[in-house]
Structure formats: structure tokens, C-alpha cells
Regions:
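C-terminal catalytic core of tyrosine-transesterase DNA break-rejoin enzymes
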Residues: 96, 174-177, 181, 270, ...
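Active-site/catalytic core of tyrosine-dependent DNA strand-transfer enzymes
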Residues: 108, 149, 156, 217-218, ...
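Catalytic-site neighborhood detector that most strongly recognizes the C-terminal catalytic loop/helix
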Residues: 143, 316-355
Length: 357
């Protein structure tokens, strides 16, 4: 309340404009409803991780008092899928709206931090910073073109190591290929354990499919709960030797698929930096491309071929645009056989060499 009063004071430095003053208090009130009586100065990184998860589930226009659809509906009803909202189908907010929401919360917490220097509060703000940066990064990238993929993954180029000359480090060989054929984020791939490479039986048959299990077990962290998923392994990855590579590591009693992947502040910046250098030497200099472009290649391929939305979401870990569909899908078990059919249909027209230790 003190913060809102401060920002509503006319003529004060940093005060809200008339339009902003109609929006920001409602966003802050939704934020306050999540934590109840807990003081803002006591908020921690874990609290912010929880709120970020919730921020992606808040319905579009939920905080707008003129939106009559939500009269009598509380955030708790939405998050628990209460009977009161069964008859309401509405969309979740886009990434840009979530980013603006998080920026509003960050400004508030920075204001609190100036008045109460709490170390835990700074870690909470850091969590918001990271998520805002991730949204900016992902939304500003495009997919690689077919020619760019060929340059990066098939042809010789000026990089000292490539798919023609060979790689001395397995993570540099596998990271781009796994991203292209699974749509997984760089952190999701770098943190994989050997136990995440597993065979899963299809519900509709007794056929087992090799899968990559994206989960948050142990020291692993995911962007959202929707990120948990099992992705069948494309035959091109199997032919390139991914299963053999994993088996060799198991024989050496390793635990991680990429033991050399280094995490810092929940990011794998070293691997991202390596790819930036590699792609630059390969001649891909467009700033709208980055490692995340592989994820766009994957989802674009599926969407351009009219793959059903539920299968695209099951493979990519994206959020449904509809809350009702999201809740329904989260409570059903996905048939890995159907997912394998989608993965096996992917053909970028590329030839890949086999990994050699």
C-alpha cells in the first residue's frame, strides 16, 4: 500500500502516469494475493520461482476489474481448477504480458530492498531478472533457415571443429543435434542424467521407444512444471550413436550425460557462448539467431505440418492457450507411441556423421 501510494503521488519522480496507474495496482494486488500476509521483505528466491510458475497460469485480463467474466473468481480457484471455473474457458497470458507483470513486481521489490536490505530479497529479485532475460532472449530469436542448418550441421566451415572435421568434446557434437530433434532448451539438455535416457513402453502397444526424460529430479531445474515431458529419440540421433555414447558413460560409472557441462547461476552460459562462437565462424552472424533457434526449428516444423496442438505441447513443454485444456492435459498420461510417430516424421534433409570417441 505504501508503494502504491508513493507511485500515485503526482509530480513525484518515478510516479505512474494516468494509464499506468489504472493497471499496476491491480497487478500488485494479484501478486499480494499469492503470498497473503507474508512481508515483501521476507520473500525468497523459492517464493519467486513459485510466483513465476503462477504468472504463466494467470488468465489473460484476470486483473482487469472491467472484465466481467472473472467476477467472483479468485486466483486460488484458477490454480486449483475449482468447480466455479469449469464453465469458463479462457486464455493464459502471452510471454510479453508475463514479462511486463514480472517487471512490475521487480520494481516493487527493488523499492522495498532500498528500505530493508535483506539478502534473501535480493535473491528473489535475481530470479525475476533471470526470467525476464529468458523471455527477452527467446522472443527475439527466429528459426534457422534450411541453408543455415546445412551450414551448421553438415557442411565444412571455417570453425576449427565441425561435423566434417570432427569434435573433441562430445557436448559440442551432441548439443545442437539433440536440440534440433527434440526442441529442448540448452539447460534441459546440459543437465541430463544418464538415467534420463530410457526406454518407455507405448500405451497402445508393447513397443518400447528410446526417450529423453526431461524432469527436475535431483539437482535439475526446469522453466515451468509444463516442461516435464518425455521426448522419443529420433532415429537420426540413434544412428549418430547417442545410445552407444550414453552406454559408454554408464560403463565408466558416470552419472551425467555431459559431465563437462558447467552450470553457473542456473545457466549454462559456457555452452551458449561456445555455440555463439561456433555459429559465427560458420558464417551465421544474424543477431536474431542463437542456440534457441533450434527450438524454433523444431516447433515450426511441427506446426507447419499441422501437427495437433496437444502433441506439439507434449513434446515442446509449452503452455496451452486455454487453462481448461492445460488442466485436462496435465492429468492424462501421454502415449509415447503417438509422440514417436511425430518425432519420426521430422526430416530436415540433413545427413549426420556418427559420434566417434
Amino acid at each position: 500500500d505504501d508503494y502504491i501510494a508513493h507511485k500515485l503521488t503526482p509530480g513525484k519522480k518515478g510516479s505512474w502516469s494516468e494509464g499506468t496507474a489504472r493497471q499496476k495496482p491491480n497487478k500488485l494486488n494479484v501478486f499480494r494475493s499469492v503470498f497473503g500476509d507474508k512481508s515483501a521483505a521476507e520473500l525468497t528466491r523459492d517464493d519467486m520461482d513459485d510466483y513465476i510458475e503462477i504468472a504463466y497460469k494467470i488468465p489473460s485480463n484476470f486483473e482487469n476489474p472491467t472484465y466481467k467474466k472473472f467476477e467472483g473468481i479468485t486466483l486460488d480457484m484458477v490454480l486449483t481448477n475449482a468447480p466455479e471455473i469449469d464453465a469458463i474457458d479462457y486464455g493464459v497470458r502471452g510471454a510479453g504480458t508475463v514479462r511486463d507483470d514480472l517487471k512490475t513486481i521487480r520494481a516493487f521489490l527493488n523499492w522495498v530492498l532500498k528500505r530493508k536490505d535483506e539478502t534473501s530479497l535480493q535473491t528473489a529479485i535475481n530470479a525475476l531478472d533471470n526470467e525476464i532475460s529468458d523471455i527477452d532472449y527467446e522472443s527475439s530469436r527466429r528459426a534457422f533457415t534450411d541453408e543455415e542448418l546445412k551450414t551448421l550441421l553438415q557442411d565444412d566451415n571455417t570453425a576449427s571443429e565441425n561435423y566434417v572435421k570432427g569434435f573433441s568434446n562430445p557436448i559440442n557434437f551432441w548439443l545442437p543435434l539433440i536440440a534440433l530433434y527434440t526442441g529442448a532448451r540448452i539447460a534441459e539438455i546440459c543437465q541430463l542424467h544418464l538415467t534420463d535416457i530410457k526406454q518407455v513402453k507405448a500405451l497402445s502397444s508393447n513397443v518400447e521407444h528410446w526417450c529423453i526424460d526431461i524432469n527436475d529430479d535431483g539437482d535439475k531445474k526446469l522453466k515451468t512444471k509444463n516442461s516435464k515431458r518425455q521426448i522419443p529419440i529420433h532415429q537420426n540421433l540413434i544412428n549418430a550413436g547417442l545410445i552407444t555414447y550414453a552406454d559408454d558413460l554408464k560403463a565408466k560409472r558416470a552419472t551425467k550425460l555431459f559431465p563437462d557441462a558447467a552450470r553457473a547461476s542456473d545457466q549454462f552460459g559456457g555452452q551458449s557462448q561456445w555455440f555463439g562462437i561456433y555459429s559465427g565462424k560458420a558464417g551465421i552472424t544474424d543477431r536474431d539467431t542463437a542456440f534457441h533457434s533450434f527450438r524454433h526449428c523444431f516447433t515450426n516444423y511441427l506446426n507447419n505440418r499441422h501437427t495437433p496442438e496437444d502433441l506439439v505441447i507434449a513434446l515442446s513443454g509449452h503452455q496451452y492457450k486455454s487453462i481448461a485444456k492445460s488442466t485436462y492435459d496435465r492429468n492424462r498420461k501421454r502415449d509415447v507411441g503417438k509422440l514417436a510417430e511425430v518425432i519420426d516424421s521430422i526430416d530436415y534433409g540433413l545427413a549426420h556423421p556418427e559420434w566417434k570417441n
